[in-house]
Design a protein with these regions (language model features):
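Cytoplasmic helix-loop-helix junction between adjacent transmembrane helices
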Residues: 106-144
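C-terminal transmembrane helical hairpin of 12-TM major facilitator-type secondary transporters
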Residues: 274-284, 289-344
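Extracytoplasmic gate region of multi-pass secondary transporters
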Residues: 31-35, 230-282
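Residue-level signature of mid-helix packing/kink "hotspots" within the transmembrane helices
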Residues: 29, 57-65, 150, 277-285, ...
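Helix-loop-helix hairpin linking two adjacent transmembrane segments in secondary transporters
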Residues: 140-195
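Conserved MFS/SLC helix-loop-helix module at the cytosolic interface between two early adjacent transmembrane helices
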Residues: 62-101, 291, 297
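Helix-breaking motifs and short loop linkers at transmembrane-helix boundaries and internal kinks
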Residues: 43, 75, 96-102, 130, ...
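Paired small-residue
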Residues: 86, 90, 101-109, 321-329
Length: 412
């Protein structure tokens, strides 16, 4: 590639950004703002709504692990494209829900599409960028979560207002259709590895580049076993678990707390959620850069500390000031841990196995996510308040902070 010419890696990273907008922004984060209207439309209680979240995360967990390995073996392009098609179709079908069983099934399948698209997308920074720029590149991809959240927070309340009682159905239809359009764009432009374009990763020169393994995309079972045989990768997964368990309680019941418990309007909740999305669009870049400078361990610990404070503020300061303070703190830190964990996975297992490594540690993240909504919904039902679930989320986040401090630096 000539000096001054845009490296194709930046185009790939932008495709990763679009992928996370659809996969996480529409497939997961939109549920938070649609949840109150969906509750009224289907007459579900909070335990059922929490279980819908759990079903989504079980699907996510299943394909995050398998999808990471499939991307390492067969290529990121085909895996992400098929996953986005599945996600788009099931989002549309969610709008047809009439029963809990059907809604649970659709949220489960949406989760599968989310996991299979999101994990390979988050590993793109490790494949296309040198280690010294890996956190920054991964942060750009994770910015799609915030952008998708912002779009959902602005768009969904308008759809709900326009279509009344059935508005939540149209919200799913529109989000699903948009995801299918994104699938087509990503298929056209994304590439799995730099060698497909005759390039080295961004930030790597020919004199610095060691002889790579053969260019073929296939990864053997022996190489896969080396990923889950590393104790340091298991510990990385444990650190990631605390994020999955804590943040999802806050995310799932964010709008329901404001609307159902605090008596605020759907528009207010949507506006505050849009603020979270807007701020979080750039938080991955910020925290990826911080982890490039401070190291993954200290970067993760600092991020967990800020996240924990945001949950406690939301639970204890029940005023508009508290709600905005919590939203700002969370928005500026929301996707910090996924960004740092994705970069760390690449640090530990290398670029070719980055998707597989991230998929493996996502097992722990997904277990936390599967437990969080059900526990949060149960605690809200028995206490008739969201205060206890948010306090629990804060305590779990602080535990993640402590665990992060013992994360070992990978050997060069």
């Amino acid at each position: 590639m000539r000096e001054g010419k845009l490296h194709y890696g930046w185009i790939v990273i932008f495709m990763g950004l679009l992928t996370t907008i659809a996969a996480h922004g529409f497939g997961r984060m939109a549920y938070t703002i649609i949840l109150p209207a969906m509750k009224d439309g289907l007459k579900f209680d909070y335990t059922q709504l929490g279980l819908l979240g759990t079903g989504n995360f079980i699907g996510y967990l299943t394909m995050a692990i398998i999808g990471g390995f499939l991307a390492a073996r067969f290529g990121t392009r085909i895996v992400i494209t098929l996953a986005l098609i599945l996600l788009g179709i099931t989002l549309i079908l969610t709008g047809l829900a009439q029963s809990f069983g059907y809604a649970f099934t659709m949220r489960f399948l949406t989760g599968m599409g989310n996991g299979a698209a999101y994990v390979p997308a988050m590993a793109l920074g490790s494949v296309w960028f040198a280690m010294k720029r890996r956190g920054f590149a991964t942060g750009i991809v994770s910015g799609g979560i915030g952008a998708g959240t912002l779009i959902s927070g602005l768009l969904v309340p308008l759809i709900l207002a326009a279509y009344g009682h059935e508005g939540w159905r149209y919200a799913w239809y529109i989000l699903g259709g948009t995801a299918l359009v994104i699938a087509g764009i990503v298929f056209a432009l994304i590439r799995s590895r730099p060698d497909e374009k005759g390039l080295l990763p961004v930030g790597v020169s020919e004199k610095d580049s060691p002889p790579p393994s053969p260019a073929g995309p296939k990864v053997s079972s022996l190489q896969w076993s080396s990923v889950y045989g590393m104790p340091s990768v298991w510990y990385l997964g444990l650190v990631y678990f605390f994020y999955g368990f804590s943040y999802i309680i806050y995310m799932t019941f964010f709008a329901a707390y404001l609307v159902k418990e605090m008596g605020l309007t759907q528009a207010y909740a949507g506006g505050l959620w849009a603020l979270v999305g807007g701020l979080s669009t750039f938080c991955g870049i910020i925290w990826g850069h911080i982890s490039d400078r401070l190291g993954r361990s200290r970067g993760a610990a600092l991020a967990y500390f800020v996240l924990g404070l945001s949950y406690l503020v939301y639970a204890l300061i029940k005023t508009e000031f508290g709600f905005y303070l919590s939203a700002i703190m969370f928005g500026l830190t929301a996707w910090s841990i996924p960004t740092i964990m994705a970069a760390a996975a690449g640090d530990f297992v290398g670029p070719r196995l980055a998707s597989a490594g991230l998929g493996f540690i996502t097992l722990f993240f997904g277990i936390g996510q599967a437990l969080g909504p059900a526990l949060g919904g149960y605690l809200a039902d028995i206490s008739r308040s969201f205060t206890v679930p948010f306090l629990v989320a804060g305590g779990i986040s602080f535990a993640g902070m402590v665990a992060s401090l013992f994360l070992k630096k990978p050997q060069a």
